[in-house]
């Protein structure tokens, strides 16, 4: 999966998908009442990017629904995965549950169109703070109460704060998620800084272990060609980047073209191959 990074304005969706992204990451902010408000990343953000682009969350969800609904004139066939980077710093342990319910209700109405020919992309809820695991409880509770528990088949989870993997496993258990159950594990840092692949390799080992909790692993934010190659050599499932075309270029190289291909809608992002 080639994950376009910080795709927070509607106009950026095509700008990232057309050069090769089949997934996009969207930053979500919450107001003081734990309600999703904007698609927005404050300053600072990645080097060589413009921080501060934003949309009202409901309008963005409608736009990305159009981009992922077959038959819509704005349909982008390649876009198959949405990663919502949930900026939960304004929440606490109790309001995280409320935020999860609110976000599920917004997705149900504005993205899934209340279950009637809505967007088809898979969804990853990426939470930076393990203490906010109750978001994961509130989200399915809202869908269940609305009679749309089937949509949880399209939803996965990620804790993105670079915590110890066993700490994340415990947080998932507290949230009622056991075993390898729709779990992506991220690792990374802003493209302005460097970070080793040590934790990525540990996550890959966990993914490939019979007693691990991880289904898929992705690394962020990867912009340099050399780092893209190193990341692929670590056997990740996804690369988050500001330059999707660079990942496409590397995937065409002989040593990678026989080992990797771009994921399509038929590839379940929550299954470990």
From Swiss-Prot:
Gene3D superfamilies: Phosphatidylinositol (PI) phosphodiesterase. One of its GO terms (cellular component) is extracellular region. Expressed by the venom gland. The active site is at residues 5, 41. Its EC number is 4.6.1.-. Its cofactor is Mg(2+). It holds the Pfam family GDPD_2. It is found in: Secreted. Its main location: secreted. Dermonecrotic toxins cleave the phosphodiester linkage between the phosphate and headgroup of certain phospholipids (sphingolipid and lysolipid substrates), forming an alcohol (often choline) and a cyclic phosphate. This toxin acts on sphingomyelin (SM). It may also act on ceramide phosphoethanolamine (CPE), lysophosphatidylcholine (LPC) and lysophosphatidylethanolamine (LPE), but not on lysophosphatidylserine (LPS), and lysophosphatidylglycerol (LPG). It acts by transphosphatidylation, releasing exclusively cyclic phosphate products as second products. This is Dermonecrotic toxin LarSicTox-alphaVII1. Disulfide bonds join 45-51, 47-192. Belongs to the arthropod phospholipase D family. Class II subfamily. Keywords: Cytolysis, Dermonecrotic toxin, Disulfide bond, Hemolysis, Lipid degradation, Lipid metabolism, Lyase, Magnesium, Metal-binding, Secreted, Toxin. It catalyses: an N-(acyl)-sphingosylphosphocholine = an N-(acyl)-sphingosyl-1,3-cyclic phosphate + choline; an N-(acyl)-sphingosylphosphoethanolamine = an N-(acyl)-sphingosyl-1,3-cyclic phosphate + ethanolamine; a 1-acyl-sn-glycero-3-phosphocholine = a 1-acyl-sn-glycero-2,3-cyclic phosphate + choline; a 1-acyl-sn-glycero-3-phosphoethanolamine = a 1-acyl-sn-glycero-2,3-cyclic phosphate + ethanolamine. GO terms for molecular function: lyase activity; metal ion binding; phosphoric diester hydrolase activity; toxin activity. InterPro entries: PLC-like_Pdiesterase_TIM-brl. GO terms for biological process: killing of cells of another organism; lipid catabolic process. It is an enzyme of class 4 (lyase). Mg(2+) binds at residues 25, 27, 85. Binds 1 Mg(2+) ion per subunit. It comes from the Eukaryota.
